[in-house]
């Protein structure tokens, strides 16, 4: 994946690339290192209104799939994380 650009990943378009760049995630390796939860937390700290679908999209990008195709168990895990972070 090292030759890939962020925009080559599923779920990551021009706007997502710009948003991720603002929080220090400038390439695929940085996204993989951060993971979906950390990347989402960075976006949340910057934007304060980052939604659950963004978290799903980041995880899907890491897995190389459209976020709609994430396993139900993974979606549930991410939703619990999202709810815990939004309450905190």
What are these regions (language model features)?
Residues 1-11, 18, 49-65:
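Extended, structured, electrostatic nucleic-acid-contact surfaces
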Residues 22, 34-48, 52-53:
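Phosphate-backbone recognition surface of nucleic-acid-processing proteins
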Residues 15-23:
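Catalytic DNA-binding helix-loop module of base-excision-repair DNA glycosylases/AP lyases
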Residues 16, 27-28, 39, 54, ...:
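Amphipathic alpha-helical interface surfaces
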Residues 60-88:
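C-terminal structural segments of small proteins and small subunits
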């Amino acid at each position: 994946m090292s030759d890939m650009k962020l925009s080559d990943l599923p779920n990551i378009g021009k706007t997502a690339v710009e948003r991720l760049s603002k929080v220090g995630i400038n390439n695929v390796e940085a996204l993989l290192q951060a993971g979906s939860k950390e990347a989402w937390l960075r976006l949340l700290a910057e934007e304060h209104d980052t939604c659950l679908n963004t978290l799903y999209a980041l995880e899907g990008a890491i897995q190389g799939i459209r976020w709609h195709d994430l396993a139900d168990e993974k979606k549930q895990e991410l939703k619990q994380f999202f709810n815990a972070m939004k309450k905190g």
